[in-house]
C-alpha cells in the first residue's frame, strides 16, 4: 500500500483513516437505536399493563356497581313489601284496639237501650219481671268508669253545692243502732251498694246484719242524676258478716265478707283464718252464698279480711281487695320476711341514716297490736265462669312495692287497674298504685304494683302516727278515704303534676273531724269544699265520679260516714255534687 495512505503513530500502531471512523459511528448509533427501541417497548408495555389494570378495575367496579344496584333494588322491593305489611298491620291494630271496641261499645249501648225500651213497653216480657230493666240511663252509660280528663294539661276545678236527691242509703232507726262500712260499685249497667247494720252500737264483733241494694242511674226532671234503687236484700241469718266488699257483676252484685264474732286483734292472734264468704245476688232475686277457701290461704294466713272498698269484674274475673296477718313460719311468711317499701317525700324527707330508716320501715309491718304478725295486702281473684264452684286464689303483691297491708279498693278506669290502700301505717299521705296482673292457667298468678307519688294532704292519725309524721315507725292508725282519679297517671317526666283526683278528706292531722270535699293534684290541693259544721265528726269516705255524656256534665258521689246525734253513732250519707272543670 502506498505510504501516503497511512498515518504513523508514536506507538507504531497503524490505523486506516476514513473508513475506520465511519464504522465506529454506525455501531454507536445502532446501539443507541436499540436502547431507544427497547425503552419505547418497555414504556409501551408498562402503559399496556397500566391500561389493562385500569380496564380490569373499571370492569370490576362496574360489576360491583351492578351488584350494589341489584341489592339496592331488592332492598327497595323488600321495603315496599314491608311498608305495605306495616300499613296492613297498623290497620289491624287500629281496628282491634280502637274501631272494634268502639263498635262493640256502640252496639252494646244500642242493645241496652233497646232492651230498656222493650222492658218498659212490654209488660209481658218474662225477663223484665219488674218492668224496669237493670240498665242505667243511656246518658250515663258511656261516662261510667272513664277518665274525665284525657289530656295532661293544667286545669282548674270547682265543686258545686250538694244536689238535693233522695238518699239510696237507709239510716239506723234507733238511738243505739249503727250503720257502718259502706262499699259502693258503679258499673256500666247498674250500681251495687252494701253496709253493715250493727245491732249493739258500733261493736262489729257482736251481732250484725248486712244491707245490700242494687239500682240504676236515672235523670231527674231537674237534669241531674238520681240513684234509683230497684232491689234490696237484707241478710239477717245470724251470721256476723264483717268488712264486706261489693262489686257489680252481670245481672247483679257479688259481695265478699268474712265471718267473725271476736275482736280484730284476736283474729290476728290465731292460727286459722276465719270463714270467708262469697255471696252472689242477682236481679231475679236469686241469692247464692258459698264458703270459700282460696288457694294460698290455709297454712299462710292467721286471718284474712276483705278490703271494704269495692272490687271489680275484669276479664271474666272477680277481683276484690283483701289484707290480713301472715303466719311467720309459713311459706309466705318466710318468702316476705325481709321485704319492705319505704317511700320518700322529696319536699319533706325524713332525716336519719338510710340503713336505720330501712330497718324501721321493715319493723313497721309487724305491729304488736296484731300479735307481731306481718300485716299483708292481697287480692282475692275468682274465675267468673267457675264462680259457682268458687275457684278463687289469693294473689299477693311484693312488700317491696307496697306498705303494710290495710283496707283498700280496686278501681277499673279506661281499662286501667288502680289500687287504693289505706294509710294505716307510718306513711301519712294517700296511697294509690297502678296495678297489673299476670294470670296463669296453672300455677300462681302474680301482680305488679307501681306507686303513684302523692304528697298533697294527710289523713288524721294518732300519737307518733299523726298526719305530720313522715318517718318510718310502727303504726296502726289513719282512716279509710279512697280517691277517684280524674286523669290517667303518666310516668313521663314533667307532666305528672297534672294528675288530678277527687274525694272527701278529714281536715285534721289528729282527729276524725271536718269532712271536706276536695280536688287535688299530686303535690297540692286545688279545691276544698267543707261539708257540714266545723268540728263535725266523720269517718270512712268513698268516692265515685261519672259523666253525663248528653251535656258533658261531671258528677261525683261522695259517700261519707257522718256523726248522728239522733239515730245511731253514724249516718251514712251520699253527697252528690257537680264538678266543673276548666
From Swiss-Prot:
Disulfide bonds: 178-202, 192-253, 244-257, 350-471, 382-392, 465-475, 545-556
GO MF terms held by the record: exo-alpha-sialidase activity; host cell surface receptor binding
Listed transmembrane segments: 35-55
Main location: virion
Subcellular location: Virion membrane; Host cell membrane
Listed GO biological process terms: symbiont entry into host cell; virion attachment to host cell
Alphabetized Pfam families for the sequence: HN
Family annotation (InterPro entries): Hemagglutn-neuramid, Hemagglutn/HN, Sialidase_sf
Site feature Binding to the host receptor, where: 422
Positions in the Virion surface compartment: 56-582
Site (Binding to the glycan motifs of the host receptor): 180, 242, 264, 323, 369, 407, 512
Positions of region (Involved in neuraminidase activity): 240-245
Membrane topology annotation: Single-pass type II membrane protein
Site feature (Binding to the glycan motifs of the glycan motifs of the host receptor) residues: 540
Assembly and oligomerization: Homotetramer; composed of disulfide-linked homodimers. Interacts with F protein trimer.
Job description of the protein: Attaches the virus to alpha-2,3-linked sialic acid-containing cell receptors and thereby initiating infection. Binding of HN protein to the receptor induces a conformational change that allows the F protein to trigger virion/cell membranes fusion. Binds to the glycan motifs sialyl Lewis (SLe) and GM2 ganglioside (GM2-glycan).
Family that this chain belongs to: Belongs to the paramyxoviruses hemagglutinin-neuraminidase family.
Protein name: Hemagglutinin-neuraminidase
Source organism of the structure: Mumps virus (strain SBL-1)
Amino acid at each position: 500500500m502506498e505510504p501516503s495512505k497511512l498515518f504513523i503513530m508514536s506507538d507504531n500502531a497503524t490505523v486506516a483513516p476514513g473508513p475506520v471512523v465511519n464504522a465506529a459511528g454506525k455501531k454507536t448509533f445502532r446501539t443507541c437505536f436499540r436502547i431507544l427501541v427497547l425503552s419505547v417497548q418497555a414504556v409501551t408495555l408498562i402503559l399496556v399493563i397500566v391500561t389493562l389494570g385500569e380496564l380490569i378495575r373499571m370492569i370490576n367496579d362496574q360489576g360491583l356497581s351492578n351488584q350494589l344496584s341489584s341489592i339496592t333494588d331488592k332492598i327497595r322491593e323488600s321495603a315496599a313489601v314491608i311498608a305495605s305489611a306495616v300499613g296492613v298491620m297498623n290497620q289491624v291494630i287500629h281496628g282491634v284496639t280502637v274501631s272494634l271496641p268502639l263498635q262493640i261499645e256502640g252496639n252494646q249501648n244500642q242493645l241496652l237501650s233497646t232492651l230498656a225500651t222493650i222492658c218498659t213497653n212490654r209488660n209481658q216480657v218474662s225477663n223484665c219481671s219488674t218492668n224496669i230493666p237493670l240498665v242505667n240511663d243511656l246518658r250515663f252509660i258511656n261516662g261510667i268508669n272513664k277518665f274525665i280528663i284525657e289530656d295532661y294539661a293544667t286545669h282548674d276545678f270547682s265543686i258545686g253545692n250538694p244536689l238535693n236527691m233522695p238518699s239510696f242509703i237507709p239510716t239506723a232507726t234507733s238511738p243505739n243502732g249503727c250503720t257502718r262500712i259502706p262499699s259502693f260499685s258503679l258499673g256500666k249497667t247498674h250500681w251495687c251498694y252494701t253496709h253493715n247494720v250493727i245491732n249493739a252500737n258500733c261493736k262489729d264483733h257482736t251481732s250484725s246484719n248486712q244491707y245490700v241494694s242494687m239500682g240504676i242511674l236515672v235523670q231527674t226532671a231537674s237534669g241531674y242524676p238520681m240513684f234509683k234503687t230497684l232491689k234490696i236484700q237484707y241478710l239477717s241469718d245470724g251470721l256476723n258478716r264483717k268488712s264486706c266488699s261489693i262489686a257489680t257483676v252481670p245481672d247483679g252484685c257479688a259481695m265478699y265478707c268474712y265471718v267473725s264474732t271476736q275482736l280484730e286483734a284476736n283474729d290476728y292472734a290465731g292460727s286459722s283464718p276465719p270463714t270467708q264468704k262469697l255471696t252472689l245476688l242477682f236481679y231475679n232475686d236469686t241469692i247464692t252464698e258459698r264458703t270459700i277457701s282460696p288457694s294460698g290461704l290455709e297454712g299462710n294466713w292467721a286471718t284474712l279480711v276483705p278490703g271494704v272498698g269495692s272490687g271489680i269484674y275484669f276479664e271474666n274475673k272477680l277481683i276484690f281487695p283483701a289484707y290480713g296477718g301472715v303466719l311467720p313460719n309459713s311459706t309466705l311468711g318466710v318468702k316476705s320476711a325481709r321485704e319492705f317499701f319505704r317511700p320518700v317525700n322529696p319536699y319533706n324527707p325524713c332525716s336519719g341514716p338510710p340503713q336505720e330508716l330501712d330497718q324501721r320501715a321493715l319493723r313497721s309491718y309487724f305491729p304488736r297490736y296484731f300479735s307481731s304478725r306481718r300485716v299483708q295486702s292481697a287480692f282475692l281473684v275468682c274465675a267468673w265462669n267457675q264462680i259457682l264452684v268458687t275457684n278463687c286464689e289469693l294473689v299477693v303483691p311484693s312488700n317491696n312495692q307496697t306498705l303494710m297491708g290495710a283496707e283498700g279498693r280496686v278501681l277499673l278506669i279506661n281499662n286501667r287497674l288502680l289500687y287504693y290502700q289505706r294509710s294505716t301505717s307510718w306513711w301519712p299521705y294517700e296511697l294509690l298504685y297502678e296495678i297489673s296482673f299476670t294470670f296463669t292457667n296453672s300455677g300462681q298468678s302474680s301482680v305488679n304494683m307501681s306507686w303513684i307519688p302523692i304528697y298533697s294532704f294527710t289523713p288524721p292519725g294518732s300519737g307518733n302516727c299523726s298526719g305530720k309524721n313522715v318517718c318510718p315507725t310502727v303504726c296502726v292508725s289513719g282512716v279509710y278515704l279512697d280517691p277517684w282519679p280524674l286523669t290517667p297517671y303518666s310516668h313521663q317526666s314533667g307532666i305528672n303534676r297534672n294528675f288530678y283526683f277527687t274525694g272527701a278528706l278529714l281536715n285534721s292531722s289528729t282527729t276524725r273531724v271536718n269532712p271536706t270535699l276536695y280536688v287535688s293534684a299530686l303535690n297540692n290541693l286545688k279545691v276544698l269544699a267543707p261539708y257540714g259544721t266545723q268540728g263535725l265528726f266523720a269517718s270512712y269516705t268513698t268516692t265515685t265520679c261519672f259523666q253525663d255524656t248528653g251535656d258533658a256534665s261531671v258528677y261525683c258521689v261522695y259517700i261519707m260516714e257522718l256523726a248522728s246525734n239522733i239515730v245511731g253513732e253514724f249516718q251514712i250519707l251520699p253527697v252528690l255534687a257537680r264538678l266543673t272543670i276548666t
